[in-house]
Curated annotation (Swiss-Prot):
It comes from the Eukaryota. InterPro entries: GPCR_opsins, GPCR_Rhodpsn, GPCR_Rhodpsn_7TM, Opsin, Retinal_BS, Rhodopsin, Rhodopsin_N. This is Green-sensitive opsin-3. Keywords: Chromophore, Disulfide bond, G-protein coupled receptor, Glycoprotein, Membrane, Phosphoprotein, Photoreceptor protein, Receptor, Retinal protein, Sensory transduction, Transducer, Transmembrane, Transmembrane helix, Vision. It comes from Danio rerio (Zebrafish).
Length: 349
């Protein structure tokens, strides 16, 4: 065994060294140099400084401008809510613990931080699944003529929360557990031990299959079909240029959001899977800490992509920031509205 299992923690270092201490009570500077903990704190502070304003601004701008309250935008707002949850209840805790060099808030604080981080990440993932399915239904039209309405959007949002809770809640009630990971400054599900009291193995398999592989496969399938349909429609010139442009813009935005999520979370999922299937193998604290902390950057990807690629939202945001005046002077009426993209008619291939 190349690690040390204790009460609600696992340290990736053998206790034969005599250095291992509880991550809830002592600084973990034997795992990494103090400057590395400070660097993680600086990184978390950076994410807090960008993540909270940009996600909060997304919520405020959508609330202030009625024209943005379109069904598709409700899902995007749900992504901003997920990002805000991660910033407020996850990043602040991790910033504080990284400064101290250990998880100073104890097992209860670890469970709360792990739950919030998992919940926010899962809401983001399942929101992207809903967006992918919406794009597939609207563009590929497997159900014929279909309009994505507010009722569909709210049902999709409810679905994302149910799926997210079904992943994040079990470790709170005894199916697996949340423990410090990497450099012991942030918490996640227990991939590290086979503790029979918590049935870790069955939970990790459930999480990987139902809450990563299945949603990612769904996203790839829907976008594979979507790309084929859009290419076929463009080749046949079945739709007007403006309609095709609107579909391409919305689809490109959602695809970039998906890619952003995968870039942020795939390294973490891959390392967690390696640890799970190679229990007892030696690995450094940084081996898990780097992808774990990098995955947190997903909270700022989606709103940045949304602002950059959605001209209507960008104009509304500038109007809000500059007290009713857009310094760029862009005409919002020139922007293709979200509602138009929802009712467009791209014939199936």
């Amino acid at each position: 065994m190349n690690g040390t299992e204790g009460n609600n923690f696992y340290i990736p270092m053998s206790n034969r060294t005599g250095l291992v201490r509880s991550p809830y009570e002592y600084p973990q500077y034997y795992l990494a140099e103090p400057w590395q903990f400070k660097l993680l704190a600086v990184y978390m502070f950076f994410l807090m400084c960008f993540g909270f304003p940009i996600n909060g601004l997304t919520l405020v701008v959508t609330a202030q401008h009625k024209k943005l309250r379109q069904p598709l935008n409700f899902i995007l707002v749900n992504l901003a809510v997920a990002g805000t949850i991660m910033v407020c209840f996850g990043f602040t805790v991790t910033f504080y613990t990284a400064i101290n060099g250990y998880f100073v808030l104890g097992p209860t604080g670890c469970a709360i931080e792990g739950f919030m981080a998992t919940l926010g990440g899962q809401i983001s993932l399942w929101s992207l699944v809903v967006l992918a399915i919406e794009r597939y239904i609207v563009v590929c039209k497997p159900m014929g003529s279909f309009k994505f309405s507010s009722n569909h959007a709210f049902a999709g949002i409810g679905f994302t929360w149910i799926m997210a809770l079904s992943c994040a809640a079990p470790p709170l009630v005894g199916w697996s557990r949340y423990i410090p990971e990497g450099m012991q400054c942030s918490c996640g599900p227990d991939y590290y031990t086979l503790n029979p009291d918590y049935n870790n193995e069955s939970y990790v398999l459930y999480m990987f299959c139902c809450h990563f592989i299945f949603p990612v496969t769904t996203i790839f399938f829907t976008y594979g079909r979507l790309v084929c349909t859009v290419k076929a429609a463009a080749a046949q010139q079945q739709e007007s240029e403006s309609t095709q442009k609107a579909e391409r813009e919305v689809t490109r935005m959602v695809i970039l959001m998906v890619l952003g999520f995968l870039v942020a979370w795939t390294p973490y999922a891959s390392v967690a899977a390696w640890i799970f299937f190679n229990r007892g193998a030696a690995f450094s604290a940084q081996f898990m800490a780097v992808p774990a902390f990098f995955s947190k950057s997903s909270s700022i990807f989606n709103p940045i992509i949304y602002v950059l690629l959605n001209k209507q939202f960008r104009n509304c945001m500038l109007t809000t920031l500059f007290c009713g005046k857009n310094p760029l002077g862009d005409d919002e009426s020139s922007t293709v509205s979200t509602s138009k993209t929802e009712v467009s008619s791209v014939s199936p291939a």
